[in-house]
């Protein structure tokens, strides 16, 4: 079995099934927003032009990250129904492993929908900054293809079966990785067609429905996506409103149905000057990485998106991630401010502030917000 296997793209049936899933969901979302909601979009033309400029794979020189607040279980994919239905407008995102990948039908559906399986530390021992989903996202934001040289699935899991549905049944290429040693997922970064891709992330990591339209603190995974790709990705901050009315956490039966007739809005900020905003911190990251690699042979020659334990836990590295994460959060706050909302309390962005919630992880909170750990 060739451990350096890569390819231009997955098999034609796999691509067709994935495109059908993406287009089907996008069509439903677009229909719901246009026919059953009062939807408005700001900054759409500029963002659409950016996506159009990226349609030619050979012309892409860097990845694209979109980042937004998270206010309902329907944010993704519903918000993308606001965009024109063009075949290159397809994002990658993260999905909670303990929710999206618990059955074979769900696993296959979300895999076809370009969702990476992400373990949450509160629910799994396999969570954290070093998990395979983060590695895959970093590689998707870089120029590939990349062989599966991290968390490689065992040989028997490289082939499709009724119990192993997240690998390409029409290809013998061994490009599956595992998130926990028991599962297998096709590694999208092993394909040239996924070079310099678009990745969307909700850094809050939880649904947060606040009457004051504030955000929780951002988790540090977003920092790895900016610091570690080969080239600093383009970053577009976003702000969404009204989706919490479509699927509010206090809704009663039938909970699974989105509520029509609501007013929703999606605001795309301008593309960030990544070199100006993140160039200096990326330079500091590279210097730190070189210093650690020089003193610790185990940290040397690691593939893209894979870090040694020292680089994951080093105090200076942690502080860098905190700094980058706060920069990203401030970018989203700028878009929020453009919607006429008052500045939030700076303490809203600090982890310590949210520790005051105590052991309650979700539900109706003391500050009158609703939180769902999803």
What are these model-derived regions, one by one?
Residues 263, 268-374:
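Fungal C-terminal region signature
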């Amino acid at each position: 079995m060739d451990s350096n296997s890569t390819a231009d793209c997955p098999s034609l049936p796999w691509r067709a099934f994935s495109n059908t899933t993406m287009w089907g969901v996008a069509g439903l979302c677009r229909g719901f927003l246009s026919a059953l909601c009062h939807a408005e979009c700001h900054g759409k033309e500029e963002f659409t032009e950016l996506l159009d400029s990226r349609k030619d794979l050979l012309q892409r020189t860097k990845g694209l990250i979109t980042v937004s607040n998270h206010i309902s279980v329907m944010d993704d994919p519903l918000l993308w129904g606001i965009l024109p239905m063009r075949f290159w407008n397809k994002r990658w995102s993260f999905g909670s492993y303990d929710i999206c990948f618990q059955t074979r039908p769900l696993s296959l559906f979300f895999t076809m929908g370009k969702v990476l399986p992400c373990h949450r530390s509160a629910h799994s021992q396999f969570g954290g900054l070093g998990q395979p989903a983060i590695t895959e996202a970093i590689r998707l934001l870089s120029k590939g293809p990349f062989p599966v040289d991290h968390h490689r699935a065992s040989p028997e899991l490289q082939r499709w079966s009724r119990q192993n549905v997240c690998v390409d049944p029409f290809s013998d290429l061994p490009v599956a990785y595992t998130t926990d040693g028991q599962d297998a997922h096709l590694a999208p970064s092993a394909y040239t067609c996924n070079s310099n891709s678009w990745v969307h992330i909700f850094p809050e990591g939880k649904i947060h429905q606040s009457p004051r339209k504030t955000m929780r603190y951002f988790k540090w995974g977003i920092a790895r996506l900016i610091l570690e790709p080969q080239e600093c990705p383009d970053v577009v901050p976003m702000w969404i409103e009204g989706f919490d009315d479509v699927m509010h956490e206090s809704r009663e039966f039938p909970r699974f149905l989105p509520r029509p007739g609501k007013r929703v809005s999606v605001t795309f900020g301008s593309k960030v000057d990544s070199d100006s905003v993140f160039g200096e911190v990326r330079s500091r990251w590279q210097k730190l990485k070189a210093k650690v690699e020089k003193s610790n042979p185990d940290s040397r020659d690691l593939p893209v998106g894979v870090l040694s334990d020292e680089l994951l836990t080093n105090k200076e590295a942690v502080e860098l991630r905190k700094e980058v994460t706060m920069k990203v959060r401030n970018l989203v706050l700028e878009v929020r401010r453009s919607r006429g909302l008052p500045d939030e309390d700076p303490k809203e962005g600090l982890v310590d502030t949210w520790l005051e919630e105590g052991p309650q992880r979700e539900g109706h909170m003391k500050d009158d917000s609703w939180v769902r750990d999803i």
